[in-house]
Amino acid sequence: MSTRTPLPTVNERDTENHTSHGDGRQEVTSRTSRSGARCRNSIASCADEQPHIGNYRLLKTIGKGNFAKVKLARHILTGREVAIKIIDKTQLNPTSLQKLFREVRIMKILNHPNIVKLFEVIETEKTLYLIMEYASGGEVFDYLVAHGRMKEKEARSKFRQIVSAVQYCHQKRIVHRDLKAENLLLDADMNIKIADFGFSNEFTVGGKLDTFCGSPPYAAPELFQGKKYDGPEVDVWSLGVILYTLVSGSLPFDGQNLKELRERVLRGKYRIPFYMSTDCENLLKRFLVLNPIKRGTLEQIMKDRWINAGHEEDELKPFVEPELDISDQKRIDIMVGMGYSQEEIQESLSKMKYDEITATYLLLGRKSSELDASDSSSSSNLSLAKVRPSSDLNNSTGQSPHHKVQRSVSSSQKQRRYSDHAGPAIPSVVAYPKRSQTSTADSDLKEDGISSRKSSGSAVGGKGIAPASPMLGNASNPNKADIPERKKSSTVPSSNTASGGMTRRNTYVCSERTTADRHSVIQNGKENSTIPDQRTPVASTHSISSAATPDRIRFPRGTASRSTFHGQPRERRTATYNGPPASPSLSHEATPLSQTRSRGSTNLFSKLTSKLTRRNMSFRFIKRLPTEYERNGRYEGSSRNVSAEQKDENKEAKPRSLRFTWSMKTTSSMDPGDMMREIRKVLDANNCDYEQRERFLLFCVHGDGHAENLVQWEMEVCKLPRLSLNGVRFKRISGTSIAFKNIASKIANELKL
């Protein structure tokens, strides 16, 4: 086994003092001679109440996994929200570390408006921090759960962006290998952001890859057959499954277990819904071709009639990456005001070091989606120069000035400016804080319960993050929205309801044939044609089955045969890295995951939840560890009463306004206070414990403490934008989708609003 060069030793309290090498690793850059004066003026002073990493104030934990967690954070210098993936390197073996740094290297070279952007990499002796773009709109998966299938016009807009981004990866000789609905995120303007490059790899023309990974319902037939492949063709098949899913709301290939699913994929037969257009059907036939040689390429598919319908004068073409704009004087002047010198700015940007300087420059060029329209004209509200209580800082940010939600914009349109290009005009009146040279130690990160509600106000925008990447399991996609799972009796109009509902799939590792000539040698982080990747099982991918009929709800969240799998040549007892979550925002706070193994594909769910670790089986699954509630046998701090002091504090509070009404479960013209009383009444009637976090926000728990039926969720009364109505927002924090649907539907149906 190859060994990686020992990592440089870094003081855990100086996590921001790093510059990056091209291979994704870091070296320490001493800034002690420059830090003194700036630290005195820094907004993140040593007495800062909230924990922070480098220049980022941590708001809350939005995902957890075996070896990593994801935190929602705010960049102190610019006020932009980011997602930080915190990976414990001490739990990874050398092979896993190679894969981790390969993923980082790949993300550094990707620069497309529909791919989640990496801003900064911070490395210490024990920990790797990936600072990434926060996609506040959540997952496409959750959008489909809430709305059912998309109309073809909407699906086309989304799909054009997806094809543009994947084709861009292919032209850079990168294959994603884990394309699925939960790895497609939406930003504040409902544009696609592809996430999770944990399974990605570089390919060469004429070379073959042999790592069998992906989510079974989206996996190409050659992967089920154990054949070697070039690379792009497996992504093309997955795109066909995604297109079918967008248009129909269900999967083209599904089964009660992995064996049945495999048989259906290898047959290549799928049902064409009556409402699907002929052009869309013909396009699917170019994607879902059993013979990979005859499968269409994305360059060919970009010219397809369905893809370009309504865009005749704007035919989808391969994305031309614009030259990086590293000389935006307005941004540079702002950074000089923060305390950076012209020389170090030019040095960092010319080499794209992905250090704190690169991150600050990129973030200054991005639209501030957090700024409230009412604050946008007030320079005093935008000023971050003075140290203020965190609640004041965050409450000055709220809705985006762009109240009108733009539907997806075609990728082939003139690409909007984003991080690496001259970003939107930066108001000259905005005063930015001096840079900070302080950071919290890793020990601060052990605080799992960092609450962002009171500290961040409405800055989070009600959006959370969603799990998807293998290593993090339920803590992988940092960008899941607050969209409740669909109820069994869907309230979505039948004309827009999919024939099959959406259910999340678990991720697992599938072992492959072991041969004597297969060695676990990774050279330069690449995979040889005889070397399969080795990853820990993933823990939260999605499956799609009917949400309307109970007999078809076979796979709740965590079902193994609905999951991302990864080929492995032999048993490994050391922890292997499956890749950190790819996008910067994760929704519910997932509990840590551990590994279990099971041999067959029958009764997968029961084996998944087994508390035993089986090391002699062929398939590996991840099971959920007990939550804090389960370990203690009770919910700490649960209360059904609101203190008088709390009432006084919140007397003037008003419900926050959500930009997206599709995450609302119930709407009413009732007074928000009366709605809260009704909610508490129904929760009491259903034996739910709850804690009032804010005047209009409840943290709820239901179940007897067992992993199978314990559900935690939030209920919040929110104002619907531009309407004289309030709504109740349901957001699942933990528990299976089926258990959440059951209790959420029951409560929603009993509310008299």
UniProtKB/Swiss-Prot annotation:
<feature type="region of interest" description="Disordered">
    <location>
        <begin position="370"/>
        <end position="600"/>
    </location>
</feature>
<dbReference type="InterPro" id="IPR011009">
    <property type="entry name" value="Kinase-like_dom_sf"/>
</dbReference>
<comment type="similarity">
    <text>Belongs to the protein kinase superfamily. CAMK Ser/Thr protein kinase family. SNF1 subfamily.</text>
</comment>
<feature type="modified residue" description="Phosphoserine">
    <location>
        <position position="643"/>
    </location>
</feature>
<feature type="compositionally biased region" description="Polar residues">
    <location>
        <begin position="521"/>
        <end position="548"/>
    </location>
</feature>
<comment type="function">
    <text>Serine/threonine-protein kinase. Involved in the specific phosphorylation of microtubule-associated proteins for MAP2 and MAP4. Phosphorylates the microtubule-associated protein MAPT/TAU. Phosphorylates CDC25C on 'Ser-216'. Regulates localization and activity of some histone deacetylases by mediating phosphorylation of HDAC7, promoting subsequent interaction between HDAC7 and 14-3-3 and export from the nucleus. Regulates localization and activity of MITF by mediating its phosphorylation, promoting subsequent interaction between MITF and 14-3-3 and retention in the cytosol.</text>
</comment>
<dbReference type="GO" id="GO:0010389">
    <property type="term" value="P:regulation of G2/M transition of mitotic cell cycle"/>
</dbReference>
<feature type="modified residue" description="Phosphothreonine">
    <location>
        <position position="549"/>
    </location>
</feature>
<dbReference type="InterPro" id="IPR028375">
    <property type="entry name" value="KA1/Ssp2_C"/>
</dbReference>
<feature type="modified residue" description="Phosphothreonine; by LKB1">
    <location>
        <position position="211"/>
    </location>
</feature>
<feature type="domain" description="KA1">
    <location>
        <begin position="704"/>
        <end position="753"/>
    </location>
</feature>
<feature type="compositionally biased region" description="Low complexity">
    <location>
        <begin position="374"/>
        <end position="385"/>
    </location>
</feature>
<dbReference type="GO" id="GO:0050321">
    <property type="term" value="F:tau-protein kinase activity"/>
</dbReference>
<dbReference type="GO" id="GO:0070062">
    <property type="term" value="C:extracellular exosome"/>
</dbReference>
<dbReference type="GO" id="GO:0019903">
    <property type="term" value="F:protein phosphatase binding"/>
</dbReference>
<dbReference type="GO" id="GO:1900181">
    <property type="term" value="P:negative regulation of protein localization to nucleus"/>
</dbReference>
<feature type="binding site">
    <location>
        <position position="85"/>
    </location>
    <ligand>
        <name>ATP</name>
    </ligand>
</feature>
<feature type="compositionally biased region" description="Polar residues">
    <location>
        <begin position="584"/>
        <end position="600"/>
    </location>
</feature>
<feature type="compositionally biased region" description="Basic and acidic residues">
    <location>
        <begin position="645"/>
        <end position="655"/>
    </location>
</feature>
<dbReference type="Pfam" id="PF00069">
    <property type="entry name" value="Pkinase"/>
</dbReference>
<dbReference type="GO" id="GO:0048156">
    <property type="term" value="F:tau protein binding"/>
</dbReference>
<feature type="modified residue" description="Phosphoserine">
    <location>
        <position position="469"/>
    </location>
</feature>
<feature type="domain" description="Protein kinase">
    <location>
        <begin position="56"/>
        <end position="307"/>
    </location>
</feature>
<keyword id="KW-0472">Membrane</keyword>
<dbReference type="InterPro" id="IPR017441">
    <property type="entry name" value="Protein_kinase_ATP_BS"/>
</dbReference>
<feature type="modified residue" description="Phosphoserine">
    <location>
        <position position="543"/>
    </location>
</feature>
<keyword id="KW-0808">Transferase</keyword>
<dbReference type="InterPro" id="IPR000719">
    <property type="entry name" value="Prot_kinase_dom"/>
</dbReference>
<dbReference type="GO" id="GO:0005524">
    <property type="term" value="F:ATP binding"/>
</dbReference>
<feature type="domain" description="UBA">
    <location>
        <begin position="326"/>
        <end position="365"/>
    </location>
</feature>
<dbReference type="GO" id="GO:0106310">
    <property type="term" value="F:protein serine kinase activity"/>
</dbReference>
<feature type="modified residue" description="Phosphoserine">
    <location>
        <position position="376"/>
    </location>
</feature>
<dbReference type="InterPro" id="IPR001772">
    <property type="entry name" value="KA1_dom"/>
</dbReference>
<dbReference type="GO" id="GO:0005737">
    <property type="term" value="C:cytoplasm"/>
</dbReference>
<feature type="modified residue" description="Phosphoserine">
    <location>
        <position position="42"/>
    </location>
</feature>
<feature type="region of interest" description="Disordered">
    <location>
        <begin position="632"/>
        <end position="655"/>
    </location>
</feature>
<feature type="active site" description="Proton acceptor">
    <location>
        <position position="178"/>
    </location>
</feature>
<keyword id="KW-0067">ATP-binding</keyword>
<feature type="modified residue" description="Phosphoserine">
    <location>
        <position position="374"/>
    </location>
</feature>
<dbReference type="InterPro" id="IPR015940">
    <property type="entry name" value="UBA"/>
</dbReference>
<feature type="modified residue" description="Phosphoserine">
    <location>
        <position position="601"/>
    </location>
</feature>
<feature type="modified residue" description="Phosphoserine">
    <location>
        <position position="598"/>
    </location>
</feature>
